[in-house]
UniProtKB/Swiss-Prot annotation:
Protein name, per record: C-X-C chemokine receptor type 6
Gene this chain is encoded by: CXCR6
Organism lineage string: Eukaryota, Metazoa, Chordata, Craniata, Vertebrata
Compartmental location: Cell membrane
Intrachain S-S bonds: 102-180
Ranges of the Extracellular topological domain: 1-32, 90-103, 165-187, 260-275
Amino acid sequence: MAEHDYHEDYGLNSFNDSSQEEHQDFLQFRKVFLPCMYLVVFVCGLVGNSLVLVISIFYHKLQSLTDVFLVNLPLADLVFVCTLPFWAYAGIHEWIFGQVMCKTLLGVYTINFYTSMLILTCITVDRFIVVVKATKAYNQQAKRMTWGKVICLLIWVISLLVSLPQIIYGNVFNLDKLICGYHDKEISTVVLATQMTLGFFLPLLAMIVCYSVIIKTLLHAGGFQKHRSLKIIFLVMAVFLLTQTPFNLVKLIRSTHWEYYAMTSFHYTIIVTEAIAYLRACLNPVLYAFVSLKFRKNFWKLVKDIGCLPYLGVSHQWKSSEDNSKTFSASHNVEATSMFQL
């Protein structure tokens, strides 16, 4: 996988504390576990993010800044998960797709990883502005929409620029088998620092600061939506911490304590936490789109239009609930967002 550089694979071949039998057991486990997890994330992420894109583009339309972000986020996650079948095959067998595909997929994988994390950060800041600066946000919706599109464009450009080391130095190497990665230790350090900063610490800091203020604001507000909004905030934070913290902690340990490369148990930890981290691509559609009542209503419209299920008379139910939600939002001069129009 893209996270596995030359040094990691070299470490697998230079263990000291593990027996040959334990090492072979680990290789067999990795050969089965990672491809299976990649395929699960691929299928779930493909379905979930495709649904979000289709509904956002053809049903929901771009009505707010949040909508702009909720088009770019599933797009990034969708392209990200589409690289996983290649890594799954390489995990079972070896890299057979050549050097050009190696560089291309490393670049695509990395660009969309950074884009997804930076957009999550922007969504967090946007929610902060909408709740804490509600009146100002409401009065400047058009300007915020324009800036949102510019910000999304900048995010894609920045993601491309910070992904250049993987694209330039990515190559195919022959260890026990052909692998796609990069073997320069200095490049690995730069890549790790960038991934930790943009892919973990930045969104984590934004969530801690913004959601702390949002929670304080909601606790002093009235309305029937307050408790549900708080639950969603805690759920978003919990999912991010549970899926991203273990793998980033392991990567940090891996970069500072090379002796762990000789421990087979540590490599189990690497691949398990890596698989957990990729679950974000499956969970983002649920956390950032399907929590919206309007989005769920549009989902049922899509289901009706493609004829998969009868509409079952749910239209009136969604309409009634949506009217209540709009009343709540309007009374607070709050722009409709995926978190607060529930």
